[in-house]
């Protein structure tokens, strides 16, 4: 069994009288440690499937198996716990608190995570050891993205 398995996943949105099928019986698997790319034209359902994998949306049918557990059947409380404890999700447009340093931004996020890692250590791991006391405006876009990852 793969680490991530999406099996026959369907997601539909209702826009007035129009039904939009964002994901139509999608199937794929990703092994643990494997790098995967989700590629497609605008409106192909890439963000939808990522939102479902990240626990921010749910599918209408199918299975979303992460490490042997089908999260497609999770209720709202279980999805919240999953988002907090089991998945990391970095958006294309991320938000850092502008008047907090990189380290303080990571410390803020670590307050809501069980067994959070040491903020200084994770900033070192993403190559920001010398920049942890800088404010977001003093960091490049890539450095800001790494703060978000940390």
Language-model features: locations:
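ABC family nucleotide-binding domain
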Residues: 2-150
């Amino acid at each position: 069994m793969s680490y991530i398995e999406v099996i026959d996943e369907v997601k539909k949105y209702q826009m007035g009288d129009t039904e939009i099928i964002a994901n139509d019986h999608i199937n794929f698997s990703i092994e643990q440690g494997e790098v995967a790319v989700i590629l497609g034209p605008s409106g192909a359902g890439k963000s939808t499937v990522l939102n479902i994998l990240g626990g921010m949306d749910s599918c209408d049918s199918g299975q979303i198996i992460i490490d042997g557990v089908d999260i497609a059947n999770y209720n709202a409380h279980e999805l919240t716990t999953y988002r907090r404890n089991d998945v990391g999700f970095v958006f294309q447009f991320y938000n850092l608190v502008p008047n907090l340093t990189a380290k303080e931004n990571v410390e803020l996020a670590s307050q809501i995570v069980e067994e959070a890692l040491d903020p200084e250590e994770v900033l070192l791991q993403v190559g920001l050891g010398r920049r942890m006391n800088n404010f977001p405006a003093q960091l490049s876009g890539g450095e800001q993205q790494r703060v978000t990852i940390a």
